[in-house]
Design a protein with these regions (language model features):
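Transmembrane alpha-helix signature in integral membrane proteins
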Residues: 1-24
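Hydrophobic transmembrane alpha-helices
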Residues: 38-45, 74-85, 135-142, 152-154, ...
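Membrane-embedded alpha-helical segments of multi-pass transporters/permeases
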Residues: 14, 18, 48, 52, ...
Length: 201
């Protein structure tokens, strides 16, 4: 559950961050700039606060449309996106500023569409930044507890919630197993990032 959920949420988060960063740098309008600033506020808000806000919004949607979205994986993924969009945004924004600025201006002057500029110029130049952004979001999601604990579907367990449940029951030795799995799952990308940074230096 943890790996699959983290991978899907990371991919969607990175895609949204890429579109936001590109739009801000390509179109340079106040509305797009404001949307970017608004989108990355989630990282400064506690996960429990975001979860309660989403639960309130879900209640309104449930009553208005007569559908049930509370306690679904879609809700949980949306919460992860709101919470960790800033992580991916920062990585991609710095990568685009470093690698793509002059190429975007050149493509605009040559009449290339925004779609062409994004996928034929920016994405190839941002491969490393995209990968790093995905890894950072993946690591954060793997260890996120408040959001997952409040918004998870019934009988849906992740490594973080399993660790919490066992620790809450005072089963400390048993809780060390999922906790160790979290460490093992995130240590590979962390080591890779450290080596990447050292190589860059």
């Amino acid at each position: 559950n943890s790996m699959g959920l983290a991978i899907v949420a990371s991919l969607v988060t990175v895609l949204i961050a890429l579109l936001l960063v590109f739009a801000a740098r390509y179109f340079k309008s106040h509305a797009v700039h404001f949307s970017n600033r608004l989108a990355i506020l989630g990282y400064s808000v506690p996960g429990a606060v975001i979860a309660m806000g989403i639960l309130h919004l879900n209640g309104k949607i449930n009553s208005a449309l007569d559908i049930v979205v509370t306690g679904s994986l879609l809700t949980l993924v949306a919460a992860y996106i709101i919470r960790f969009l800033a992580v991916a945004w920062q990585s991609l924004d710095s990568g685009m500023e470093r690698n793509c600025g002059q190429f975007n201006e050149a493509s605009k002057s040559l009449g290339a569409s925004a779609f062409t500029s994004l996928f034929r110029i920016n994405v190839p130049l941002l491969r490393n930044a995209l990968f790093v952004a995905g890894l950072l979001v993946f690591v954060d999601i793997m260890k996120e507890l408040p959001l997952t604990l409040i918004l998870r579907p019934f009988n849906f367990e992740t490594l973080s919630t399993r660790t919490f449940d066992l620790a809450f029951q005072s089963k400390i030795p048993e809780s060390s197993v999922p906790a160790l799995c979290i460490v093992l799952a995130v240590i590979v990308p962390v080591v890779w990032l450290n080596r990447k940074i050292e190589t860059g230096k």
